[in-house]
Every structure is written in C-alpha cells, then in structure tokens.
Amino acid sequence: MVLPAHLQNSLMPSEVSFLAENEYITILPRYSMKKLELIGTKVPTLRGMRREKIPIWIAVILKSQDKCNIVPPEWLNLIYLKEKYEEELKQPHKFSVLPWNWLEISKILLNKAADDLSDPTHQLRSIIQDLREIRLVKSRKGLKELNESNIQLDGLSLLEINELRPFVLTVMNKLRQLHESVNTKTDRGTGNDQDDDMYHDVSDNE
C-alpha cells in the first residue's frame, strides 16, 4: 500500500502509539500470577497488591481483565500539568520538559484506565489539550526562524515532532533551494566583476 505523501516521511499515528505502548508502567496486581516469557519481553512473577513494572500494552490487557490497577505516572495529574502550562506561557522561546511519549501515554490511560487516575478525566483532558495547543503554536512560530540546515526542536515529544515533520521538511527544502539560488547569483556576480577587471587591465595596457 502506497502511503499518502504527507505520511511518507513520518510515522503513522498507530506506529507512534505502538512505540509508546512498549514503555514500562507500574501496576498493582489484584492476583498472583506466574512469570511469563513472551517474544521480546518478560512479565515477572506478579503477587497480589505488590507493585511491579511491566510494558503498558500488557498492563492494559490485565486491566481489561480486572487483574490489576494501573499506577499513573507522577506527571499525569492536574497540578503537574498546570505547572508545565505556566512554564510554557513564561518561556515563549523554550519548551517545558515532558516525557518523550506524554501525549500517547496520557491518551492510553485516559481511555483504558480512567478509574485509576487521581483527577477528573475531563479536567485532565482539558489541560492536556491546552498544553498541546500552546506547544504547537510555539513550534510553528519557531519555524519562522528556520535555516536550511537545521531546526531546534528540543523538548518536543515524539508525536509532536512527527506531526510537524512533513511541514518542516517542506519548509527546509524551500529554504535550501532559496539558499542555493542566492549562492548561484553571488557566484555569477563575482565572475562578472572578474571579467570587468580583466577588461580594464587590457584597456590600460593599450
């Protein structure tokens, strides 16, 4: 299957989500379970009410079977996210530090483990959306300061970079073409000046 042009140079949303699901998260098992050997990962022996870290995708499966509760990451709460939002407002040229997959993990937990979150989900969704929007505005403003060789995207998450990448590549290609065009004109101008100097030298000798 041929991907649309805007997706050929970036990951699909499902691929970004897949990568996020492989990160580890803490769970609180409701029952004891024997160790599992899976392709590419292992699930340690689980004991009831004893915290353990496992991949998010496994935690979601166990959660759906009522076999565990998911312990939310320290950053997934209203106080922390509001602080980050304030940081974004105070630092117009810098992004606040957030986990690499904060958007995807937030989405997964809000959809699959809402009852394990300490704050109302509608408030969490609201502040996450506000945070995402202000970071998007800042990143687009930052594109105005692009040059043809690099762009500074420190602090952005994988999903945020992935969403910007097609546009960034297009802009950088245009800037590179413009840069090359200016250099070509400059080289031609230098060549003409040298020809003029040679002409004057010949005239003086005559």
Swiss-Prot record:
Region annotation Disordered: where it falls in the sequence: 182-206
SUBUNIT field: Component of the GINS complex which is a heterotetramer of SLD5, PSF1, PSF2 and PSF3.
Its annotated function is as follows: The GINS complex plays an essential role in the initiation of DNA replication. Has a role in chromosome segregation.
Q: Which UniProt key words apply to this protein? A: Chromosome partition, DNA replication, Nucleus
- InterPro entries per record: GINS_A (IPR021151), GINS_bundle-like_dom_sf (IPR036224), GINS_Psf2 (IPR007257), PSF2_N (IPR056784)
| Primary subcellular site in the record, as a coarse category | nucleus
Entry's localization field: Nucleus
The major lineage groups are:
Eukaryota, Fungi, Dikarya, Ascomycota, Saccharomycotina
UniProt feature, compositional bias: Basic and acidic residues: 197-206
Q: Which domain of life is it from?
A: Eukaryota
One BP annotation, GO: nuclear DNA replication
- Recorded protein name is DNA replication complex GINS protein PSF2
Q: Does the keyword Nucleotide-binding apply?
A: no
State the family named in the UniProt similarity comment for this chain. Belongs to the GINS2/PSF2 family.
GO cellular component annotations, sorted alphabetically?
Answer: chromatin; CMG complex; GINS complex; nuclear replication fork
Q: Does Cell membrane appear among the keywords?
A: no
What organism does the UniProt record list as the source? Answer: Debaryomyces hansenii (strain ATCC 36239 / CBS 767 / BCRC 21394 / JCM 1990 / NBRC 0083 / IGC 2968)
Pfam families for this protein: PSF2_N (PF25005), Sld5 (PF05916)
